[in-house]
Amino acid sequence: VKIRPVEKKDAAAILALIKGKAEFDGCLSSLHATENDIAEAFFGSQPKACALVAEVDQQVIGIATYYNIYSTFISKPGIWLDDLFVFSQYRKMGIGKALMKELCAIATKNNCGRIDWIVARDNASGRAFYQSMGASIFEEVRHSRLDVAAIKNLASQPA
């Protein structure tokens, strides 16, 4: 297994992995990204995200997408892990852990105070995987979101 930073040539593979994650999460209908969107997000003039990929026999079979964050509480930068996904036939081979290990190396190099992400309550194997690496699972925290319609609605309201 080779873990490396994503390259522009990987855009189609990135999209296939993200589609696989959306299927795994049961939210494929929410996936609107295209290969061009991926190329722009990761390799455009102002990249929005980063990624590591896992390769087996020169085939991309796993991914960790992430971006930089900042914690005011600990006054340090951090990383938000957006997606961690390995195709099912390559699971239980240490590939997810290898991706996480490389992400931790990046976090250490950049003096990050933490890496954050979400994991579904019903994803028992994912929760166990993360806890096996020393992660804390915060049951009391709820993920919140404003979608595009809510953002536009709130932004257009009078002060």
Annotate each predicted stretch with a short phrase.
Residues K2-A16:
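A short beta-loop-alpha structural element at the N-terminal edge
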Residues L15-A41:
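Conserved GNAT-fold acetyl-CoA-binding loop/helix
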Residues E40-V53, W80:
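A short helix-loop-beta-strand connector motif used in the catalytic cores of GNAT acetyltransferases and
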Residues V53, Q59-N68:
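Conserved beta-strand in the GNAT
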Residues A54, K92-M100:
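Glycine-rich acyl-CoA binding loop
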Residues K97, K101, R121-E140:
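Conserved active-site alpha-helix within GNAT-family acetyltransferase domains
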Residues T108-I118:
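Conserved GNAT acetyl-CoA-binding A-motif
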Residues W117-G126, R145-V148:
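Conserved beta-strand-loop-alpha-helix junction that forms the acyl-donor binding cleft
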